[in-house]
């Protein structure tokens, strides 16, 4: 490989994320080992605002803070594989703020506060860093897999011909399965010489002796009205109290008794 190809391979970069506007703060020194809180950062401590780019350079990931107009580099944070927590630390009281460890490339470093305007931008920032870690892990697994396959190479013997030659046969002994009780009873019933007796079924229940009443005739039917009048006459003829002429003959006359009572009363009054 020539020197130019090595230089191109070293300078190969892949941009993972671009955020147009971020803010950088001068943060006070950490007093406890718990972490940083963005609530302690003052608005007057804001020292810079510009563009953020997350760039993948082979195994290393770089967080670059650049000028939005000119593209000049303000600061850079280098994230080594497997050591993300040493370079990028999230704030304890907000998901939009982080603390970056910036390096000048000569062994000097400092800690600054990084703030995103929107929560989804901070989420994309975390996703970009995680994607780079996964990419580096896959590349390492691929390299180790290739080396292990080359070291553990096994010669495969040619396939053996197991086909039968002319005149050869195969004998297979099959053990009969034991019959269960249900299948034995069924087979015994089917193998019997006698004819199977038909099942005696009970006769269906008789219908109840209920007769339906005939439908009434229409009200204006002349035949129905004539039958009704004849029936009324017949019923009156058969009633014992319908003819009272015989009783009137046997009853005493009320006219004579009434006249006798009236004459007796009159005579009694005159005598008084």
From Swiss-Prot:
One GO-annotated biological process of the protein: endocytosis
Cellular component annotations (GO), alphabetically ordered: membrane
GO terms assigned for molecular function: ATPase-coupled transmembrane transporter activity
Listed SUPFAM superfamilies: PH domain-like
Feature: compositional bias, Polar residues: 243-252
Region span, Disordered: 136-157, 174-272
InterPro entries per the UniProt record, alphabetical: NECAP_PHear, PH-like_dom_sf
Chain intervals with Low complexity compositional bias: 253-272
Pfam families recorded: DUF1681
UniProt superkingdom: Eukaryota
Residues in the signal sequence: none
Gene3D superfamilies recorded: Pleckstrin-homology domain (PH domain)/Phosphotyrosine-binding domain (PTB)
Amino acid composition bias (Basic and acidic residues), ranges on this chain: 136-156, 231-240
Protein's recorded name: Uncharacterized protein At1g03900
Native source organism of the sequence: Arabidopsis thaliana
